[in-house]
Amino acid sequence: MVDTTKNTKLFTSYGVSTSKTVAPEMAAKLISKAKRPLLMVGTLALDPEILDRVVKISKTANIPIAATGSSLAALADKDVDAKYINAHMLGFYLTDPNWPGLDGNGNYDMVISIGFKKFYINQVLSAAKNFSNVKAIAIERGYIQNATMSFGNLSKAEHYAALDELVDFL
């Protein structure tokens, strides 16, 4: 079992609170309990190993995908519910309780992020952390301070194994 709760050295100094580390099993439980989760996918998920696991997460838990950057093209033929949105705009929209969501059925109660550079996703999730009730779980390779919960800093092999465990627990 991969220990995703270790090595949480901060590389940024902003914010008054930091995310709690989360193991794949607990992340899967929280994702399963969410009423309206959204999988937020960045361009770093274009790595075939990550992309395969993103598709498995989406299909296993029936979670729609917010495809940001150039990730939509890679998801187009994967038979998943993926829609394009700018990542910063998504962070802004998540703070609006009246936002209809990408499907018109209302805002989300949880966002799961994967495939982003650390400095970028920390800024995007800062809005959700400080101005909404939306919970954010970062299943990134690096520890994300502004998520509600995050994996720790992992090697590539540990990250792949942690994502596999997450899929198994969903």
From Swiss-Prot:
SUPFAM superfamilies recorded: DHS-like NAD/FAD-binding domain
Family label: Belongs to the CdhB family.
Organism: Methanosarcina mazei (strain ATCC BAA-159 / DSM 3647 / Goe1 / Go1 / JCM 11833 / OCM 88)
Stored Pfam families: CO_dh
Protein name in UniProt: Acetyl-CoA decarbonylase/synthase complex subunit epsilon 2
Membrane in keyword set: no
Keywords: Methanogenesis
Role, per record: Part of a complex that catalyzes the reversible cleavage of acetyl-CoA, allowing growth on acetate as sole source of carbon and energy. The alpha-epsilon subcomponent functions as a carbon monoxide dehydrogenase. The precise role of the epsilon subunit is unclear; it may have a stabilizing role within the alpha(2)epsilon(2) component and/or be involved in electron transfer to FAD during a potential FAD-mediated CO oxidation.
GO biological process, one term: methanogenesis, from acetate
Pathway: One-carbon metabolism; methanogenesis from acetate
pH dependence comment: Optimum pH is 8-9.
Alphabetized NCBIfam families for the sequence: cdhB
Subunit and partners: Heterotetramer of two alpha and two epsilon subunits. The ACDS complex is made up of alpha, epsilon, beta, gamma and delta subunits with a probable stoichiometry of (alpha(2)epsilon(2))(4)-beta(8)-(gamma(1)delta(1))(8).
